[in-house]
Amino acid sequence: MSVQGPQRRLLGSVNSTSPAAPRLGLAANQTGPRCLEVSVPDGLFLSLGLVSVVENVLVVAAIAKNRNLHSPMYYFICCLAVSDLLVSVSSVLETAVMLLLEAGTLAGRAAVVQQLDDIIDVLVCGAMVSSLCFLGAIAVDRYISIFYALRYHSIVTLPRAWRAISAIWVASVLSSTLFIAYYDHTAVLLCLVSFFVAMLVLMAVLYVHMLARACQHARGIARLHKRQRPVHQGLGLKGAATLTILLGIFFLCWGPFFLHLSLMVLCPRHPICGCVFKNFNLFLTLIICNSIVDPLIYAFRSQELRKTLREVLLCSW
């Protein structure tokens, strides 16, 4: 990543005599002796990345194989899996190259490694932006399917879905390129943080509204069966728990990374903020964990997809 010094891992590996120069002027000793730094072993990071790669490859393969899954909703889920796959592959590739450089197995000039690092950074940033976009697209798709059920297939058509998907990928590539090129501009960081907040608010509003509609529907059914309280309370608790898990995981996995970006704008030289900066690799690990959890939340809950997944695993193409 290109947002702050210690995470420029490839360049730091080439010049082992001196650590990579921190970006935005953060001093190496600025964080003080009392900072809590959570170290993520490279083996654990690689293992999580590989698990994410396998999961998301299976999701893409299952959707590609089953024509019944060739619908806008599953195309959004497939693109989310591709985004998570790119995040994991890029992170694993960067870590693997860094380990090979440190071990002396791989030799490279600083200029070459700089170019490789920039390419990986663009992939990671673009995949992160597209992942957030497709999470929002899935929320919008589900919202339309509930509140405009009779008109859903006329609103969410395949051409419109493909246009939305194309726009998301183009915007992700352009924004990630600009982010890497102008990483030291405050406006770029503020745009990324604002984008995350917008996606969080969008998902929260849509899913809360969907939960309210589900509870309202349950109350109507309960009145007909004269079992209002048990049915309504049971569905309300289940829906609230699902909503809490969905938004909680999203915020837990993505929030620390964007907190890091926010603090880079607000207090890049403050010792307390420096303590947060030292845990950047932990924040990347949480994003990898999100790439592992996404298929469980959005893909594997589908019975049709699970059935196809079993066929894929049994190689019955």
Swiss-Prot record:
Cellular-component GO terms for this entry: plasma membrane
Stated name of the protein: Melanocyte-stimulating hormone receptor
Residues in the Extracellular compartment per record: 1-37, 94-118, 184-191, 267-279
Family from the record: Belongs to the G-protein coupled receptor 1 family.
Cytoplasmic topology ranges: 64-72, 141-163, 212-240, 301-317
Transmembrane portions of the chain: 38-63, 73-93, 119-140, 164-183, 192-211, 241-266, 280-300
Source organism of the structure: Puma yagouaroundi (Jaguarundi)
Topology versus the membrane: Multi-pass membrane protein
Main location: membrane
SMART domains: 7TM_GPCR_Srsx
Known outcome of mutating P22L: In strain: Isolate Hya36
Glycosylation sites: N15, N29
Subunit (UniProt): Interacts with MGRN1, but does not undergo MGRN1-mediated ubiquitination; this interaction competes with GNAS-binding and thus inhibits agonist-induced cAMP production. Interacts with OPN3; the interaction results in a decrease in MC1R-mediated cAMP signaling and ultimately a decrease in melanin production in melanocytes.
Purpose of the protein: Receptor for MSH (alpha, beta and gamma) and ACTH. The activity of this receptor is mediated by G proteins which activate adenylate cyclase. Mediates melanogenesis, the production of eumelanin (black/brown) and phaeomelanin (red/yellow), via regulation of cAMP signaling in melanocytes.
A Pfam family per the record: 7tm_1
Lipidation positions, renumbered (S-palmitoyl cysteine): C315
Compartmental location: Cell membrane
GO molecular function, one term: melanocyte-stimulating hormone receptor activity
Keywords annotated in UniProt: Cell membrane, G-protein coupled receptor, Glycoprotein, Lipoprotein, Membrane, Palmitate, Receptor, Transducer, Transmembrane, Transmembrane helix
Domain of life: Eukaryota
InterPro entries xref list: GPCR_Rhodpsn, GPCR_Rhodpsn_7TM, Melcrt_ACTH_rcpt, MSH_rcpt
Gene3D superfamilies with a match to the protein in the record: Rhodopsin 7-helix transmembrane proteins
